[in-house]
């Protein structure tokens, strides 16, 4: 299933962990990346976290909140997302908000007390393999 802008055809995909090296070498990393989905925003589907070999979980935001991914039924699925990778500092308030979106416990949310410098992806388009028909979307609320 596709979400957001169309992914350019014949685009070579990169593993998530390759983004850091691309940023270091070229100053930025724009392209098609692939990874396995760990979780998605339970509120509206405006972000997902993905994993890749030899790298911590990284967050993928949907560019300008222009589209959303399913809130459930996508964990463990392979995804391709087209967009930009960059490093950014997430404020304490934003981290807490994201934890709330993920359904974290109050103890987990309260434990956040310092900004976090992280690798972030901003996706213009997303493809998720094998999304079941009727997967809950934000519009299903």
Model-based region annotation:
Residues 1-141:
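OB-fold and OB-like single-stranded nucleic-acid-recognition modules
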């Amino acid at each position: 299933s596709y979400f957001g802008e169309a992914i350019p055809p014949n685009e070579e995909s990169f593993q998530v962990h390759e983004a850091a090296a691309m940023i270091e070498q070229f100053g930025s990393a724009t392209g098609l990346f692939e990874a396995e989905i760990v979780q998605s925003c339970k509120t509206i589907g405006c972000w997902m976290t993905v994993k890749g070999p030899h790298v911590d979980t990284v967050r993928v935001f949907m560019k300008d909140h222009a589209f959303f991914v399913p809130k459930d039924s996508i964990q463990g699925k392979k995804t391709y997302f087209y967009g930009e990778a960059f490093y950014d500092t997430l404020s304490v308030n934003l981290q807490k908000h994201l934890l709330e979106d993920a359904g974290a416990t109050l103890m987990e949310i309260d434990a956040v007390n310092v900004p976090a410098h992280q690798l972030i992806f901003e996706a213009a388009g997303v493809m998720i393999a094998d999304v079941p028909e009727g997967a809950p979307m934000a519009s299903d609320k």
